[in-house]
């Protein structure tokens, strides 16, 4: 318990159970919330530890692989976390769930930074200074509609992640912690964690 992916799955199960029960009785106002709360709590209680253990195991594998092979590991982690950051899911939650630390967390931070700064710079002509700040210090998630229309605009950020990820892990030995691994330049948290 206490892990973002486990909480998401528990909430999803609660929503589905609530949808199944809703509209079936005359006392829906009582039955539906009770079923949602109980099913979500049970799912979180019983599935949460296994989900948490699986995520920690995956995180340990990632941490070990980047430590053993900082060039290849740096490329993979940097590119994947940069992509995750830009998608409408929480890269910080994934970094925390996996427990990314050390060189792997540093490479993940660089991947997130490449996407945020990359999109901020390439969209400057249209978005001016406000867009530069919103995407550079906020989130590159603002570009999801543009990526859906033209996925090629993602290539410069992905390529820069692939180049700078191993630079951070193999040459500069940049390290971070689980929270900083998924933050990128958002509020400049990733660099200082």
Which residues fall in each region the model found?
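Pore-lining transmembrane helices
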Residues: 1-193
